[in-house]
A protein has these predicted regions:
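Active-site helix of classical SDR
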Residues: 123, 159
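Residue(s) in the substrate-gating loop at a strand-loop-helix junction
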Residues: 143
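Substrate-binding pocket helix/loop in short-chain dehydrogenase/reductase
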Residues: 99-100, 107-109
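Conserved glycine-rich cofactor-binding loop
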Residues: 8, 15-17
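Conserved glycine-rich Rossmann-like NAD(P)H-binding loop of the short-chain dehydrogenase/reductase
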Residues: 29-45
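The beta1-alpha1 cofactor-binding region of Rossmann-like NAD(H)/NADP(H)-dependent oxidoreductases
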Residues: 40-41, 62-73, 105
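Active-site loop immediately N-terminal to the catalytic Tyr-X3-Lys motif
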Residues: 101, 148-154
């Protein structure tokens, strides 16, 4: 098992669900967790879970994975605060279930922008930091939806496959 004590871990999409669980698990294992989510989304529950897991300080950051300026700012701020970034858990995801005949180009693009482009641009932004450090881990959250079609989830399934 990879030792997490003292490691700096950015978790995207951490306000709820799997991202929240990842952040709390990393915190329990001693990581310096940086839970992130879209601006305006409450991180209070995630902060509480991380503190219950044993960390004293939880540094959260607003981060819109569809905005490269937001990504660059988050990476720079975390690097400035902690001096390194050891782990990126790229978990942010969007699903907009609806019948196929109702999926507009805007719906399709919104899902792809978060699930594909966001994951790619996060990795692209953090990779130079990790390369300069000579170490780092990038973890992408996938889904069985990428392997098994689900009714009314065409864009999501395509983005996870």
């Amino acid at each position: 098992m990879y030792e997490l004590t003292g490691k700096v871990a950015i978790v995207t999409g951490a306000a709820a669900g799997l991202g929240q669980a990842i952040a709390a698990t990393f915190a329990k294992q001693g990581a310096k967790v940086v839970p992130t989510d879209r601006p305006g989304v409450s991180m209070d529950e995630t902060i509480e879970m991380c503190k219950k897991a044993g960390v004293e300080e939880v540094y959260t950051h607003d981060l819109d994975v569809t905005d490269q300026d937001s990504i660059a700012k988050a990476i720079a701020d975390v690097k400035e605060k902690y001096g390194s970034i050891d782990i990126l858990a790229s978990n942010a995801g969007l699903n907009r279930p609806m019948p196929l005949d109702q999926v507009t180009p805007e719906v399709w693009d919104s899902v792809m922008n978060v699930n594909l482009r966001g994951a790619f641009f996060m990795a692209q932004a953090v990779a130079p930091v990790m390369k300069a450090q000579g170490k780092g881990r990038i973890i992408f959250t996938s889904s069985q939806a990428g392997l098994v079609a689900r009714e009314n989830q065409q864009p999501y399934c395509a983005s996870k496959g």
